[in-house]
Amino acid sequence: MTKKRFPGKWTVPGGRVTTDDYINLPKDTDECWYNILERVVRREVKEEVGLEIKNIEYVTSLATIDKEGTPILVISCMAEWESGDVVLQESETDQYAWVSSEEAKGYDLIGGIVDEMLMADERRNGRKSEWKKSM
């Protein structure tokens, strides 16, 4: 359960890209760093819940505006567990649960999360899907 932007709501691990995620790394080409999104997803999951993940895949994206009026682009991904046990970053999260997409419908989730979980299920089963509101 998240404590920050949506206190008391259930969600999935997440965060933001900062220049610290790549600025001190060697560039992959003369001008660019590659796989930054994947590095950030790995870092955020490790920081927030203590798990190592692999095989990160894009699910969908959304745009929102924060309280200060700043536009935010959210890129949702799915991944496979690689190693580790859940250890919560207490400043971010105070509870966790492993649930199916169907079970998630019984939780007070941030809007759209169940729909994203359903999309991830479709992709895991080899079917392409686009976001649609299910509830």
What are these regions (language model features)?
Residues 78, 87-120:
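NUDIX/MutT-family hydrolases
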Residues 50-61:
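A short coil-to-beta-strand element that immediately follows conserved catalytic motifs
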Residues 62-85, 120-124:
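Active-site-adjacent beta-strand/loop module that shapes the phosphate/pyrophosphate-binding cleft
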Residues 55-57, 76, 95:
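Extracellular/lumenal ectodomain signal focusing on beta-strand-rich modules
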Residues 7-10, 70-71, 111:
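Short aromatic-enriched loop/helix-cap "lid" or pocket-rim segments at secondary-structure transitions
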Residues 1-43, 47:
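Conserved Nudix-box catalytic region and its N-terminal flanking loop in Nudix hydrolases
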Residues 114-135:
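Charged phosphate-binding loop/patch that engages nucleotide di/tri-phosphates or the phosphate backbone
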